């Protein structure tokens, strides 16, 4: 038995979907442990692109059990649309299981997300307005509705009526917008419950049984380390824990059951939304990387902010997630660059710092200290072994390993499942 956690080591969008899909070949179960449909992952199999938001990437394999864990917040309407999408592509979701402890995104969560972001004005945090944050707020406030509650009409109605009364007062009196009809929501979500009932179970027991049977388990995170509610660039963060430790809480398994934690990191850096970004390139080079890497959000379509690789960030991710290895993605995006820069530290006032600062104000004042490396100026998309890579590309990867203190396990040289270089075994 082996358990591997896949986490984003930057600000999300690192290519976790592709890496999870690749590793899922040798896994028996694939479990998603946090986030919601604010995150998207794209998987390319034999040139065919699949875009998913809630269902784990492992669903593309017919023999894998896929789990949506208790740490995920679920919009049932979105989930059902995703099931229909997979069905239209000839992919069965019979092996999907959903934790009854996962919290449910309600229509009032989406409305609150929208009006609160509008109220912030210039201080907006860049939410996707899909109700993720407000759903997690209700979870912490202990007034949330869980998937298991949807299956109990009496319990669901009681919780819903109480919540709608409170949310309507907030929406109407504070934000000046219309509230909701509890009966309409009840009818809509009971229909969702009927559709999803067969998938809902105690997934913690399922995972524990699999562990005892010696099966390989892959845990899939969403977003990235720097979007973690505690360890990210607060307040420009998500509402959950994308770091390695989030897997144990969000899937209902003990920390001693984890064998490897793999951090997925791009060969450069991107960010969506607001907040400081020390290596950001607001010039032609940034545009070039954005176009070459097709850097537009899976969920929002927003253009991603692009910059050079930041080793300060990666060392931070190694520390807070306990990364044992890394997967470097989109190495091919750098194929035609004559010079490539790596941020090795930050210049703050009169000193150079090598640790990621806690203060957002301090981070915003940091200037990157760069180390330059020669580009390889050749196509890597057909490479399948380390030896096939150009020497300068191999040197670049080696330097990233040295600066981050983390060995590379996988290299991605294109979006397709086959465009992956294995340097070691995950399971």
UniProtKB/Swiss-Prot annotation:
Mg(2+) binds at residues 13, 40. Pathway: Purine metabolism; AMP biosynthesis via de novo pathway; AMP from IMP: step 1/2. Keywords: Cytoplasm, GTP-binding, Ligase, Magnesium, Metal-binding, Nucleotide-binding, Purine biosynthesis. The keyword ATP-binding does not apply. Signal peptide: none annotated. It catalyses: IMP + L-aspartate + GTP = N(6)-(1,2-dicarboxyethyl)-AMP + GDP + phosphate + 2 H(+). HAMAP family: Adenylosucc_synth. Plays an important role in the de novo pathway of purine nucleotide biosynthesis. Catalyzes the first committed step in the biosynthesis of AMP from IMP. This is Adenylosuccinate synthetase. The lineage of its organism: Bacteria, Bacillati, Bacillota, Clostridia, Eubacteriales.
């Amino acid at each position: 038995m082996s358990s591997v956690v896949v986490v984003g080591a930057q600000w999300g969008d690192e290519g976790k979907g592709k890496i999870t899909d690749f590793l899922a070949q040798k896994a028996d179960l694939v479990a998603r442990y946090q986030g919601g449909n604010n995150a998207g992952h794209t998987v390319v199999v034999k040139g065919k692109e699949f875009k998913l938001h809630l269902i784990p990437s492992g669903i593309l394999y017919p023999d894998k059990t896929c789990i949506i864990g208790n740490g995920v917040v679920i919009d049932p309407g979105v989930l059902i649309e995703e099931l229909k999408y997979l069905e239209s592509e000839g992919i069965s979701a019979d092996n999907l299981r959903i934790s009854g402890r996962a919290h449910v995104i309600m229509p009032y969560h989406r409305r609150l997300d929208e009006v609160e972001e509008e109220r912030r004005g210039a201080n907006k945090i860049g939410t996707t307005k899909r109700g993720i944050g407000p759903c997690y707020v209700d979870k912490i406030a202990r007034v949330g509705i869980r998937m298991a509650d949807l299956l109990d009409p009496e319990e669901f109605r009681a919780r819903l009526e109480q919540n709608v009364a409170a949310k309507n007062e907030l929406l109407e009196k504070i934000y000046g917008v219309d509230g909701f009809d509890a009966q309409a929501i009840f009818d809509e979500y009971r229909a969702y419950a009927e559709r999803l009932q067969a998938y809902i179970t105690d997934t913690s027991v399922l995972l524990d049984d699999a562990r005892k049977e010696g099966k390989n388990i892959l845990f899939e995170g969403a977003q990235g380390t720097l979007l973690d509610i505690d360890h990210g660039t607060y307040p420009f963060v998500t509402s959950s824990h994308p770091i390695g430790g989030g897997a144990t809480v969000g899937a209902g398994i003990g920390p001693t059951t984890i064998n490897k934690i793999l951090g997925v990191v791009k060969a450069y850096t991107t960010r969506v939304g607001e907040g400081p970004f020390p290596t950001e390139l607001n010039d032609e080079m940034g545009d070039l990387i954005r176009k070459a890497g097709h850097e537009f959000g899976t969920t929002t379509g927003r253009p991603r902010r692009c910059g050079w690789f930041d080793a300060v960030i990666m060392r931070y991710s190694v520390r807070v997630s306990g990364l044992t290895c890394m997967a470097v993605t989109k190495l091919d995006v750098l194929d035609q660059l004559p010079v490539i820069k790596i941020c090795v530290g930050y210049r703050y006032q009169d000193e150079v710092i090598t640790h990621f600062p806690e203060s957002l104000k301090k981070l915003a004042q940091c200037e990157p200290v760069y180390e330059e490396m020669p580009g390889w100026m050749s196509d890597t998309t057909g490479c399948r072994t380390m030896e096939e890579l150009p020497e300068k590309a191999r040197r670049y990867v080696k330097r990233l390993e040295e600066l981050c203190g983390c060995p590379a396990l996988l290299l991605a040289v294109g979006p397709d499942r086959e465009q992956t270089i294995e340097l070691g075994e995950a399971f």
